[in-house]
């Protein structure tokens, strides 16, 4: 059987940037565990705030966390109360000075994480899986995507045997490295168990910047 490579991991360093931007030698494992703890904490605290990507940069005793969210008002809170509380909790968690940048996602329907999350929440509310996928596809195509593919897998409609069912519209060129493909995987907790939701969104081509090579013209 043919298996699909992770569309984002395949494009990192070509048209995608890293979500963690730091370098370490002996402290590598400590930093990695700290990154995972930060991401887990933010995803738990801001579960309703439509947070998609969490980027982490490091300097000496300083951590810069950039949150890409469709609901910046919910993250910031009244007079900045929520973001101040989050910063204090992250300072305590890491023992370092944490700076938080909030970046608004202008088109949530073109973000695979948010589209997948929306489908998963609908499945938890007993919306038919076909309807949830087709509605998400229509919204994404209306938002200007070149193509989208979705897949829901598990005990669909409570069936005894798990299966996967997906829909697509437009083109999703998984082999084209310059194709800007956003991918996400989400889970829905239903009464019959967990359902997996996968979303691929093709947003157009990106021409990678030419890198200067030593001795190159």
Swiss-Prot record:
Pfam families documented for this protein: KH_2, Ribosomal_S3_C
SUPFAM superfamilies documented for this protein: Prokaryotic type KH domain (KH-domain type II), Ribosomal protein S3 C-terminal domain
Coiled coil: none
Bilayer-crossing regions: none
GO cellular component, one term: cytosolic small ribosomal subunit
Stretches assigned to the KH type-2 domain: 38-106
Superkingdom as given in the UniProt entry: Bacteria
GO biological process, one term: translation
Keywords annotated in UniProt: Ribonucleoprotein, Ribosomal protein, RNA-binding, rRNA-binding
Example of a GO MF term: structural constituent of ribosome
Record-linked PROSITE patterns: KH_TYPE_2 (PS50823), RIBOSOMAL_S3 (PS00548)
Keyword RNA-binding: yes
Subunit note: Part of the 30S ribosomal subunit. Forms a tight complex with proteins S10 and S14.
Its biological purpose: Binds the lower part of the 30S subunit head. Binds mRNA in the 70S ribosome, positioning it for translation.
Stored HAMAP family: Ribosomal_uS3_B
NCBIfam families: rpsC_bact
PANTHER family in the record: 30S/40S RIBOSOMAL PROTEIN S3, SMALL RIBOSOMAL SUBUNIT PROTEIN US3C
Family: Belongs to the universal ribosomal protein uS3 family.
Name of the protein: Small ribosomal subunit protein uS3
Chain's gene name: rpsC
